[in-house]
Design a protein with these regions (language model features):
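Catalytic phosphate/metal-binding cores of nucleic-acid and nucleotide-processing enzymes, i.e., regions
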Residues: 1-163
Length: 163
């Protein structure tokens, strides 16, 4: 396998037809993904309370305590058995009406290079976009957003089209 780079990750995203909303060339200070997710959730639930019960973050990140040894593997196996999907996007809005697609957002930092700093981050990202591409092929609105503002704008467009 070739060495993973930011450029190769972005090229793969494009090949799979997964949209990135935001400026991929931006480099600079920005909020972390968790802050962006909280901002997106607050904007959606405050401005669209009628959809608040349909909108949620998928908490599928897991950092094991190295002192626990094999507990990490047991925890991962248990999560997998319960249907936790590795690579699932960060934010989901279930269909806002009958016939509307789900809204699936993978949140990255405004400076995407900060989200994809390590080889491990890049591999995980490729797994995420493969899943997003599959979900998009099955009718979902599935994309990567560089910050909450872009995701929120995409949500407004989604509501205008599907309400």
């Amino acid at each position: 396998m070739n060495k993973l780079t930011l450029k190769s990750c972005l090229a793969r995203t494009d090949e799979l037809g997964v949209e990135i909303v935001g400026d991929v060339s931006y480099r600079g200070e920005c909020n972390k993904e968790d802050g962006e997710l909280a901002t997106l959730h607050q904007k959606i639930t405050f401005n669209f309370p009628e959809y608040a019960h349909l909108a949620f973050h998928v908490p599928n990140e897991f950092t094991a305590d190295k002192s626990k040894g094999n507990a990490k593997f047991a925890h991962i196996a248990k999560r997998k058995a319960k249907g936790v999907k590795n690579g699932m996007c960060d934010y989901v809005v279930l269909p806002i009406r009958l016939g509307a697609p789900p809204f699936l957002c993978e949140m990255k930092r405004r400076d995407i290079s900060l989200s994809l700093k390590t080889a491990k981050n890049k591999l995980h990202y490729l797994e995420q976009i493969e899943l997003l591409a599959s979900q998009k092929q099955h009718g979902a609105i599935a994309f990567v957003s560089l910050g909450a503002d872009y995701a929120y704008q995409k949500f407004i467009e989604y509501v205008e089209k599907w309400k």
